[in-house]
């Protein structure tokens, strides 16, 4: 059935659902203290506070010299890196356009593309000591499906980190609860000395997201 063949009443119900959903989102944004704080402090997104909180707990940015930001748009995480590690070389990538950030090299391309890893490494001019991934697949509202789609991105990010990180380096990634994390954690524990997970206060309570923090990269076999 084409869109034009739909019952007008059905179209109206769908429109009402979209309107209600948009209204809830807008209300949440307007009443979110992190959104207000981000705007007041000049951060591009409330997500900046997630990295700030993770860094305060795990010391991720101390001594960072080369940092990769996977899923950089709109740029909040790279802003934090730039402020806390001003001497670090920062490279980010995202399918979505990202406004320039001083001192940050940004690639507007798909991280899953074959040429992406080489482009990132070439821009860094050396192995990264921190790989950040705030990537998430477009959600469909079904927790298990959203989890699996995002896990595909996370697994690719882990592979990139293991192939490129300097010994002693760290990896941070967003995941969604869903019960298929066992293999991911096993790979991380094999390659890093410590692997922990955290849900920073800036993560919304009703969100199933959490972050995996892997530190002390053991290095690649010779």
UniProtKB/Swiss-Prot annotation:
Indicate whether Translocase appears among the record's keywords. Answer: no
Q: Where is the active site?
A: 174
One matching Pfam family: FtsJ
Broad class of where this protein is predominantly found: cytoplasm
Q: What class of enzyme is it?
A: transferase
Q: Give positions of region: Disordered.
A: 1-22
Compositional bias, Basic and acidic residues, is annotated for 1-13
* Record's keyword annotation contains Methyltransferase: yes
In Swiss-Prot or TrEMBL terms, this protein is called Ribosomal RNA large subunit methyltransferase E
Name of the encoding gene: rlmE
